[in-house]
Amino acid sequence: VQGTLSPAEIIERTAQHVRALLPGDSAHDWWHVERVRRNALAIGAAESADVHVVELGALVHDIADWKFHDGNDALGPSRAAQWLSELGEKPEVIEHVRTIVTEVSFKGAHVETPASTLESRVVQDADRLDAIGAIGIARAFAYGGHAGRAMYDPDIPPQPHASFEDYKKNSGPTINHFHEKLLLLKDRMQTAAGRRIAAERHEYMLAFLERFHAEWNGKC
């Protein structure tokens, strides 16, 4: 198909491909990708980003998530690039999307995850917005159940992971995940729109945690 598909056709083929590939975990399913795509397009437009690159990056950002491939974080960028190459996408677009997929993931509380291009910053923010707020709470418990994690254990404190390897090995209770990742995301947003949306979603999570602990302790 090299050289025969329009940008719109490449987007549509990629959406179909990703939808067929994604795992059964409802926290990382097609609807997660679709929400990230919508967020990314809105943020990208506000930031005057290349929306074709942004949309492709959002669509393939979880094409081979390390959480479902034995911790292999090189597989996603490789598969994204291979797929786009098969569609005849421009080499410079392929490399840009590969960079987005490489940079998108959170890798631990004490691990820097800089995004090297505007489009990468847009997709990273869009993905992180889907990890916080009401949707983020639902996704956290959906994945925790999928992974067989405890909901909460007051005897197991949160762990401030110092490396990506430590973060990959984490199997702590879902409530800990709020302190290990979700509550950190507000201050790591890299676009104006991302920061604005994250601030409200962050407050929602704080209110949820306050209520959760009150109910856990029989205070309401």
Kindly give the residue locations of the regions a language model identified:
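An active-site-proximal "capping" alpha-helix that borders the catalytic cofactor pocket
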Residues: 36, 72-86
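Conserved strand-to-helix beginnings and helix N-cap segments that scaffold or border functional pockets
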Residues: 69-73, 134-135
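Hydrophobic, well-structured mid-protein blocks that either form specific transmembrane helices
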Residues: 87-124
